[in-house]
Swiss-Prot record:
Residues 598-632 are annotated as: Disordered. This is Chaperone protein DnaK. The keyword Membrane does not apply. GO terms for molecular function: ATP binding; ATP-dependent protein folding chaperone; unfolded protein binding. The lineage of its organism: Bacteria, Pseudomonadati, Spirochaetota, Spirochaetia, Spirochaetales. The modification Phosphothreonine is found at T198.
Length: 632
């Protein structure tokens, strides 16, 4: 078995790690960063940018720069109304009811898994550059409170990126693995994970290499983005008061406000106030307008208090579901960049009655845990067992629109449960099995994961047929359901794929698109490198002509000038092979100047000249070898 990489596919940033010699290692990307912005952009030339380069052009290209796409993963369009208001790009309803992004620069509607796949591809390439070998397998993390559709969407993203996703792991569980890899004694830990777009709380029991999740809870609509949004709303309100100009419909201004808000939030974790200066934010008839405010930590904490308080209830529920009291918990581990906010650390202390443990890097712990899980699967991380849970209850709709639960939330996975049902009407020959996920009593109040029909049931009075419904949740938290007529033995099975999910055909098409993008990216890089070499050669040759042009024949000088012109013309076009051949031709022609420079250097150094003469023919042979090497 090859290497299995661990990927934290985050809302704001992503991170990749690998097990080496029994230890997890975080891999730096090509820009030298240990985390990569989860941002994908498309330029007006249709070029795809991923990571920091995409982030760098957000302000000037807001409608084609996609960030926080994780908030839309596996979601139906009607479920993301609040998320749509937070982003400048266009989110539309897809053909099958899911949320999709319309990217004007490439005139294409893209699914969230397809966009996330671009970030996963960057992570995959980062690992491949480090390892010097192809990577095809990964463990990818998701928020613990992700439902089945969101988990399936994450697996689809991995497939589109050319990765066989060996395991989907809950982020708090991964962080606990990172924390507990070298811990030998038994303890109960709480993982408080506040990322860019989601909040999770998990309670785990650690001991003797066993990591057992006791309970989990969370909010998939709460994260650092919401804190940024509060600052943005405040700045828009204050600026409108001062200048009577509303910035809320100016997409470029909003993008600048988002950057400034994120920066101010980060600054306020270490300072009591942050200055926000955005010159030329807009203009009116009187000229340009500048935005300048000072935000204090006290004001910020007042603005976000309702968000901070929203994390309290899930924590209390998780403690209760685990059958514990807050005082039973030995350590509280903070994960996610937003846990650096002092108000968050304060409420954690209030809930659990202790200072949180800050020994784990909140940006890297999840990827490290994913790499450890990869090591468990390959056998590199020995004597470790991970027992996770399903975050939400699963069941089916029964008579009267009631949800009948088969698997309760916080059940250890993998698991399988069966229950026998019957028909609701006389002579009923088929049953429609509607699969639900959630905690409400009525079916209509829970999420429909999918439905299927078991037909061919022999006509009989109601209540007579025996239909066994079985739920099977695998280690990834993905649901498989079957229904069997006990009388005839006829069985119908499905792997739940949300009605708003991607079809196999769509995934295959997206895989091919991703592969073609990889080829495009390679060609683009090759073209840029060829242009850089050509420009550098033109500059050096023109400089040398100025200095030594009088010392070569007019014929040679004219030939070099012609080759420079031909190379400049090739630079204007898009034919890379022509550019390379013209670069080679100028290189050959410029050797005449190199000869003159060499002779000049010899003439100006008599001692060196004598030494060269004494060296005899062997020295000349070496010179020719070096020139020959250059030609290669």
């Amino acid at each position: 078995m090859g290497k299995i990489i661990g990927i934290d596919l985050g809302t704001t940033n992503s991170c990749v790690a690998i097990m080496e010699h029994g230890k997890p290692v975080v891999i730096q990307n090509s820009e030298g960063g240990r985390t990569t912005p989860s941002i994908v952009a498309y330029t007006n030339k249709g070029e795809r940018l991923v990571g920091q380069v995409a982030k760098n052009q957000m302000v000037t290209n807001p409608e084609n720069t996609i960030y926080s796409i994780k908030r839309f993963m596996g979601r139906r369009f009607e479920e993301v109304a609040s998320e749509i208001k937070m982003v400048p790009y266009k989110v539309e309803k897809g053909q099958n009811g899911d949320a999709r992004v319309n990217i004007s620069n490439i005139k294409k509607q893209m699914s969230p898994p397809e966009i996330s796949a671009a970030t996963l591809t960057k992570m995959k390439e980062t690992a491949e550059a480090y390892l010097g070998e192809k990577v095809t397998e990964a463990v990818i993390t998701v928020p613990a409170y992700f439902n089945d559709a969101q988990r399936q969407a994450t697996k689809d993203a991995g497939k589109i990126a050319g990765l066989d996703v060996k395991r989907i792991v809950n982020e708090p569980t991964a962080a606990a693995l990172a924390y507990g890899i070298e811990k030998k004694h038994e303890e109960i830990v709480a993982v408080y994970d506040l990322g860019g777009g989601t909040f999770d709380i998990s309670i785990l029991e650690l001991g003797d290499g066993v990591f057992e999740v006791k309970s989990t809870n969370g909010d998939t609509h709460l994260g650092g983005d919401n804190f940024d949004d509060e600052i943005i709303k405040y700045l828009i309100t204050e600026f409108k008061k001062d200048s009577a100009i509303d910035l809320s419909n100016d997409k470029m201004a909003l993008q600048r406000l988002k950057e400034a808000a994120e920066k101010a939030k980060i600054e306020l974790s270490g300072a009591q106030e942050a200055s926000i200066n955005l010159p030329f934010i807009t203009a009116d008839a009187n000229g340009p307008k500048h935005l300048q405010y000072t935000l204090t930590r006290a004001k910020f904490e007042q603005m976000v208090d309702h968000l901070v308080q929203k994390t309290k209830e899930p924590c209390l529920k998780a403690i209760k579901d685990a059958g514990l009291k807050a005082s039973d918990i030995n350590e509280v581990i903070l994960v996610g960049g937003s846990t650096r906010i002092p108000a968050i650390q304060k409420i954690v202390k209030e809930i659990f009655g202790q200072e949180p443990n800050k020994g784990v890097n909140p940006d890297e712990a999840v990827a490290i845990g994913a790499a450890i899980q990869g090591g468990i699967l390959t056998g590199e991380a020995k004597d470790m067992v991970l027992l996770d849970v399903t975050p939400l209850s699963l069941g089916i709709e029964t008579l009267g629109g009631v949800m009948t639960k088969l698997i309760e939330r916080n059940t250890t996975i993998p698991t399988k449960k069966s229950q026998v049902f019957s028909t609701a009407a006389d002579n009923q020959t088929s049953v429609d099995i509607k699969v639900l996920q959630g905690e409400r009593e009525m079916a209509s109040q829970n999420r429909v994961l999918g439905n299927f029909i078991l037909d061919g049931i022999p006509a009989a009075p109601r209540g007579v047929p025996q239909i066994e419904v079985s739920f099977d949740i695998d280690a990834n938290g993905i649901v498989h359901v079957s229904a069997k007529d006990m009388g005839t033995g006829k069985e119908q099975k499905i792997r739940i794929e949300s009605s708003s999910g991607l079809s196999e055909e769509e995934i295959e098409r997206m895989v091919k698109d991703a592969e073609s993008h990889a080829e495009e990216d390679k060609k683009l890089k090759e073209g840029i490198e060829a242009k850089n070499i050509a420009n550098s050669l033109i500059y050096q040759t023109e400089k040398s002509l100025k200095e030594y042009g009088e010392k070569i024949t007019n014929q040679d000088k004219e030939a070099i000038e012609n080759k420079i012109k031909e190379l400049k013309d090739a630079l204007e076009g898009s034919d890379i092979s022509l550019l390379k051949s013209k670069t080679e031709e100028l290189q050959q022609a410029s050797y005449k100047i190199a000869e003159m420079m060499y002779k000049d250097a010899q003439a100006s150094s008599p001692d060196q000249n004598n030494a060269q003469n004494n060296a005899g023919s062997e020295s000349k042979e070496a010179d020719y070898e070096v020139v020959d090497e250059d030609k290669k």
